[in-house]
Amino acid sequence: MGKLGKKARKFAKKNLQSVEKRSRKLKPFIKKKFAKRNERHQAGDKQEKKVEQQPKKRCQEEEFQDIAIDAVFGKDDDEVLRDGDSDSDGYLDELVNETDSDIMKCKVLSRSFLATCCDMVDKEQYVPALVRLLNWYRAACQYGHEPSGIARPNIYYDIEDSETFAKVIIFVLQKADHTFRSILGLSDSSTKEKILKLKNNPKWDSLKPLVKSFFRSTLHLVKQAGDLEIISFTLTQLRVSIVFLAAFPDLLKKLIKISVHLWVTGEETISQQAFLILKDISMVFNSECFDSCLINMYKAFLHDCDIPKANSEQRPFLRDSLVELCSQDVQKSYTKASVSITQLAKLLKMALATKNKEAVEKIHSGEYINCVDLWVNFISANVQDCDLQPLLYTIVQVINGVAQLIIGPRYLLLRVKCIHWLNHLSRTSGIFIPIASLVLDMLEYKTTNDGEKQEQKLEAVSTVKLPKNWLKSQNFQEQCIFSVIELLAVHFAQWSFHISFPDLATIPVMRLKKFHERSTMEGLKRVVKRFIEQVESNIEFVQRKRDDVTFSPNDQQSADTFMQLEKQNANAPYTQYYQSIIDKALGTNKKKKK
Amino acid sequence: MGKNRRKQKVIPPPLLPPDVAEEDIEFSDEDLKYVKENTDYAQFVSQIDTAAINKQCGGRVMTVEDKYEEERSKRKTLQEEKGNGEILVDPVDVLPVKTLDGKLHYRTESKKSKLAEAETDEAEKDVLEDEHVLNKSQRREKAKKSKREAKKHEKDLPDEILQEEEETPQAAVLAEVKEELSAEESFENKKNKIAELGMLLLSDPEANIKTLKDMLDICKDQNTKIVKLALLSLLAVFKDIIPGYRIRLPTEKELEMKISKEVKKTRFYESTLLKAYKSYLQKLIIFEKQSVYNQIANRCLCTLLEAVPHFNYRDNLLIAVVRNISSPDEVVRRLCCSTIRYLFSNEGKHGGELTVQAVRLIADHVKAHNCQLHPNAIEVFMSIRFDEDIGKPNKEDEHNKKYKKNNKRKTQEEQNQVQENERKKSKKDMMSKIRDEVSADHRGVTYEPDAKERRKMQTETLSAVFETYFRILRNTMYTIGERTEEIPTSNPGAFGSHPLLAPCLDGLAKFTQQLDLDYMGDLMNYLKKLASSSSSVSNNTKQKNSKLLTVSERLRCCLVAFKVMRSNLNALNVDLQDFFVQLYNLILEYRPGRDSGVILAESLKIMLCDDRHQDMQKAAAFVKRLATFALCFGCAESMSALVTLKTLLQKNVKCRNLLENDAGGGSVSGSIAKYQPYATDPNLSGALATVLWELSLLSKHYHPAISTMATTVSNMNTSQSQTFLSAVTPQQAFADFSLVKESFEPKNESRKLNNKRKRESLPEEAKNVPEIDMVKLSKKLKENFTILRDIKEDERVRMELLQSEEKKPLKKQNNVVKKKLKNPKSKKQI
């Protein structure tokens, strides 16, 4: 911006008339104030960028070596965008009013004039009126944020009042797409290829600057606006005409960058709208845009995971939306996922071999855990449609390694999360993943001071490690047992109708019985007792069905179809018990949130 | 000589003044004066020479005598008396000066008497010195020096005075130099002393054996560094000096006999060496108890025991080393353990005697500390080696013992006597078998005593080792079975509750071949009780949980039992069912991360895979339990269980009924019609009545190797062509599939991806919902926003007003422009 200012000054000195010089003397006083404000905004942006860039580099260099290659690609994107910014951005030419432009030095938009133009554009698709309207739209979008360089000093646009301002923006955002399509003779369901063919259309040559001006102004509005609903409305309308961006790749990249930023930092509605734009871009345009969207979102997601937040409620949304984007093109996402999971496996292997504090801390960092969470959800979402067996195998090994890296009660939350992941993968893929040994090991977490009844509030701790004080509390042990029962319940629910359920449940039931004999807390005893009874009743249930069967373990298909009717029927006793446990778990989660 | 000196001395005083007067007065008598002067000079020269020689000789004698007297004073007191004689010599030096200064006759006479006495003493000393000390070369040097000094004295008398004055500051300088020695210099001096003494001993030990005492005295120094250096130096010296044989002191009779000089020297040398060595060892043992010298003392003791295990006082060394076998200091403990391992593995140096003593001492040590030692203390036994020959007579004894059962005599003495008789009989048999060759007889005669002694020593070693092992087993049982009343008295030691149990069981497994049949029954009973310790202690409180044996420890007991039976080729009819029962139950109690999976895999291999005779019921029970085990544990454990399961099914064809679901399986299952998953006895579980349904779930395992193995096992019955023996053992399977070793990369990557987009419709539904509301809200907010921007316009207007009147015409022009714009619009509308 500073560079442009200098050029503008030189241009002004050379080309201005004496009378216009006087008017310039008056204007700088007003502009200086706004210039200072702009500088402040820019400085703030620079500081934020510096802060953001540093942790990204550290993360990329340290843990994900292959992704660092993508970082170089990202830099190239930034350079391209910067080049795009340096293009000259001026008002459109008004051919009809050339004679008037010499006389008129300042144009003010009035209500009546606006109404006339709107009617002409809306009903008759009169191109000159559209040109004027887009110029006023540009002025409205940049109102209060005019750039210092003006290409046409003889024209100055101003807006009469607030109502006119609002009408201009709303009308253009609502009607622009329809108008463009009607002029070009396109339908609403036109595809990218048709738009690319527009280059052969003679009308496109005259209409292209208008479309470009519209998009540029809209992007500027999205950048500068601070209001929630204005941005949301703008993004919603921008989605409708996103196909036209095929002709403007620079603007497309700029939009991707802005959308990723809003997706990560915005609130719920803005984040959703931004994600929808990114999704449309990845669906409509070619594979390069998909790659850039995926890479930018992935980096932003990991960067966001590094920052500790009080409210981490939005993170699941970010993760789910990223998974949804990856699911659009599983072929390409598979490549990215395999690279990332391989990196996770290497880090884990180092930690298992050396047991260094640094290596273990990397494994226990929020970034590593959230990355595993991301890929677990991705594989769970797509494992039935596609063949993701290698990814599934590797990620399960990684999760087992993380759970067994350090055995101790302080890492209870991490272990519970790992087992949740394994249960999730098993449920969605239909593959058997044993978790009993991991779960039952938590029964061995013995607390010293059993008599103490410290009712410390178990707030939702997002950290991986628990403080030492909590290990002595009674609530901790209760949480251990409830987690064990919940996890086993989920595991058994998946296989409760499988022919080998009695054998699967033998060892866990035996361990729980011993625990039941050993423990002295009545509440825990009651819960464990009920769980054991339910499992045993289901064992008898399956046993009776199994005795009537005529096939042998060789016959895999008939084994799979075993008890299908009972499975669909939701009145099975264990299913009801499982639902009650899940409801209790949800209830406890709600209480925790409150 | 004395008389001549008296006459000469009387003459000079009267002659000197008149000669001078004559010279000054008469010039014509110059010739006469010259002659007289010459005669006087000749007389003076003779006098001066004798005095100078006497003085010079006296000084040299003093210097030499001082040196030798210093040395002799350490040895003899007589030399001190001679030192007293020197004092008489000192005033002699002073006398001639005074005589020259003083002119009184009386003083000169009194001094003359003293001079006479001194002269006599000097003469005697010269004679002694010449005989003993001075050599020809030294004599010549003295003669030259005397001549030089004579030339000097020819010049003038005052030169003598100057020389005398020079001597006194030298003495002062020496005194000052001595005072300047600081502690550091004394430290270095002591270091040098240690080095010199060491070098002397190493160069010629027989001649310099007495210096050992000097080095031992240095050990009493207060500086710890010097003490350490002295100890290490003595260690190096003793290493080299000590001969390759054991020193035997002479008896009283031998002392009375006449001995040659050479024998006297060697005896003196040996007795002195032994005394010094003994005192050195005593000091080491004392220093060992002090924390400052603990490590160095132990290092010296261990090094000596390794270097000279054959020498005298080795018992004391061994006692000290064994005492520190379970020292809390890790460095000391490692030193001692490695030393004892060295002794066990290098019996050639000491003939095996130290092995017996060491094992005995360790056994006593374990007994004294009530089995609460560091595990390293007993791992040492693994280095002991026994000859293969020991087994043969033992086996013969075993056969004979079977016959002895009728007699029922079990006293040790009788057994020893009977063994001797048996040995004689065996020898006779050997003689009878061999053709009566002379060479065979000679060989037998020459080697018999060595073989006998060696067997005795090794049998004693074995008995001590097994005594220790059985004590540990008994102690373990006792601690587990303690009553609640004795809880506070028995606390686990610093090394854990049962630190010696694991090395004890490992040792038993190694030495099973040397174990007697009589002890096997006891051993098996102990192992049974230990392995089944959980059932008997089930009612105890939580506080006792630390005393219970872990799963891996109980698995070790089962392992040892099977190894014992394996090595004896199942000679005994011992019931091993209890161990199978324990293994059957321990499989359920296994916990990865806390218990060792390697031991589980090893026990599966030895007890199930390598077992020859198995009951069908038992095999089926284990097959079923291993399948259940594979469903609940990680890759490594599951894989080892499946490998074992496959091996069992391959060996027992009838057990393959588990792979099929036959309605009429009642006849095969036997008495029990239903499978009891929680049964504790494998024979009563009724496993044949069930089917291996676990395999259908395991075939869906996420690990491809496990799913493949499960599929192979389930198809074993139908496709018999695949029944080849698997080369993989449970141990290898466990090692290969553990998380640390296994690679995380999948081997076969198949990228056949089928894109199915089914979720496109869902997000579209969410689009329409917020639009309606947003339109209204956005309008309202934009109006507010524009209001804010109106404020900005007002600011602009203010700026314009503030500047000057010049703005007014610009405004007018703007108004004109606006008016003109309106006009064309109206025309267009028309």
Curated annotation (Swiss-Prot), chain A:
It is found in: Nucleus; Nucleus, Nucleolus; Nucleus, Nucleoplasm. A motif (Nuclear localization signal 2) lies at residues 35-42. Residues 1-21, 35-58 are annotated as: Disordered. Residues 1-13 have a biased composition (Basic residues). It comes from the Eukaryota. Disruption phenotype: Plants lacking both CRC and RBL exhibit strong floral meristem (FM) indeterminacy with reiterations of extra floral whorls in the center of the flower associated with reduced AGAMOUS and SUPERMAN levels. A motif (Nuclear localization signal 3) lies at residues 512-519. Interacts with SWA2, NOC2 and NOC3 in both the nucleolus and nucleoplasm. Binds to ENAP1 and OBE1. 'Rebelote' means once again in French. Collaboratively with CYP40/SQN and ULT1, influences floral meristem (FM) determinacy in an AGAMOUS and SUPERMAN-dependent manner, thus contributing to the floral developmental homeostasis. Belongs to the NOC2 family. This is Protein REBELOTE. It comes from Arabidopsis thaliana.
From Swiss-Prot, chain B:
Residues 67-84, 130-140, 391-400, 420-436 have a biased composition (Basic and acidic residues). GO terms for biological process: DNA replication; ribosome biogenesis. This is Nucleolar complex-associated protein 3. It comes from the Eukaryota. Belongs to the CBF/MAK21 family. Transmembrane segments: none annotated. It is found in: Nucleus; Nucleus, Nucleolus; Nucleus, Nucleoplasm. Residues 1-22, 67-86, 112-169, 391-436, 802-830 are annotated as: Disordered. Keywords: Coiled coil, DNA replication, Nucleus, Ribosome biogenesis. The lineage of its organism: Eukaryota, Viridiplantae, Streptophyta, Embryophyta, Tracheophyta. Residues 61-81, 111-156, 400-429 form a coiled coil. Residues 141-150, 817-830 have a biased composition (Basic residues). A motif (Nuclear localization signal 1) lies at residues 138-145. InterPro entries: ARM-type_fold (IPR016024), CCAAT-binding_factor (IPR005612), Noc3_N (IPR011501), Nucleolar_cplx-assoc_3 (IPR016903). PANTHER family: NUCLEOLAR COMPLEX PROTEIN 3, NUCLEOLAR COMPLEX PROTEIN 3 HOMOLOG. A motif (Nuclear localization signal 3) lies at residues 806-813. Component of nucleolar complexes. Interacts with RBL and NOC2 in both the nucleolus and nucleoplasm. It comes from Arabidopsis thaliana (Mouse-ear cress). A motif (Nuclear localization signal 2) lies at residues 408-415.
